[in-house]
Amino acid sequence: KEGIEMIPAILGEQDILKYLATTPGIITTNALDPGIYVRGSNSCENGFLTHDMEIASPDHLTGILSTFDPFILNNSTVYKSGFPAVYNSYLSSYINMRPDPGNKQKYEGEITLGLVSSALKIKGPLVRDHTSFAASFRTSYLQTIARLYNKSVKDQKQQNFMPEYAFNDATVSIDSKLSNRWRVTAFGLFTIDGLSMKLNENVNYDFNWHTFSGNAGAWYTPANGDILHFRLGVKSAFSEGDAEGTIPMGGGNRNYSIIARIMYTHSFLDKFQWNI
């Protein structure tokens, strides 16, 4: 997190992917593109995970910002080569992020005001000394700026309307120490994007994009020091577009994925893992 705070904040928002682009072998094409390119590869060949569970989408609809808030996702491991055997299907890199467990002793938070969005962030105890949380909620006001501009256009027949784009995201992390042997965690990332365009005085186009990524896990440590780890992950993406005009058109797409993982660790070198 300290490293992220040292780089310029694009549009007033700190971004994890912009920070990764300052590390060796990783670049980004421009300030308004959240995609990263590892050793010359394509930006779509990077896998983004939390607790080894894949994220539905790393960036918002128009690509202005990523969906990751460093207030919560402030620790990560980047694999640019030599991927562990558990990772597969992506060719370029894997970024495995670990959510902040929160503060089990006191509350803390911050409010950020950027050029295109604002955010409210808070962390603290749910049950002091046992259960903590961290939460972040971000919303944009780009759509308000565009709406004011479009109303100021004198000739509504001209095709110079500004697209009305809005994005929102919410990130929540919970960490609970039930006993000396049991620990439970949960993580959720939810995004809502909307894009409305007036192509001309007769044709309007609306597009909605929603994603959800979540996982929950439990660790059990018996008396002999071994570790048994269970984790269940879910991700989904939903998109829908509609055009109103002379010929109405529309369409949509839904995608869901569920994975279960069991890991047994006997020592630093002896690990066994099963995926479902």
Where are these regions (language model features)?
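Periplasmic N-terminal accessory/gating domains of Gram-negative outer-membrane beta-barrel systems
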Residues: K1-F83, Y94, D100, S117
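Hydrophobic, lipid-facing positions within transmembrane beta-strands of outer-membrane proteins
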Residues: I16, P34, L91-S93, Y107-G109, ...
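Short strand-turn segments of transmembrane beta-barrel domains in outer membranes
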Residues: G63-S66, N74-A85, S93-G124, S132-T139, ...
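Transmembrane beta-strands of outer-membrane beta-barrel pores
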Residues: K80, P99-P101, L115-S117, L126-R128, ...
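Transmembrane beta-strands of outer-membrane beta-barrel proteins
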Residues: Y107-I111, T131-A135, V184-A186, L228-L232, ...
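Transmembrane beta-barrel wall of Gram-negative outer-membrane proteins
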Residues: V116-T139, Q156-G194, D206-L228
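Outer-membrane beta-barrel translocator domains and adjoining extracellular loop/strand segments
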Residues: A146-S152, F187-T191, L195-N204, G233, ...
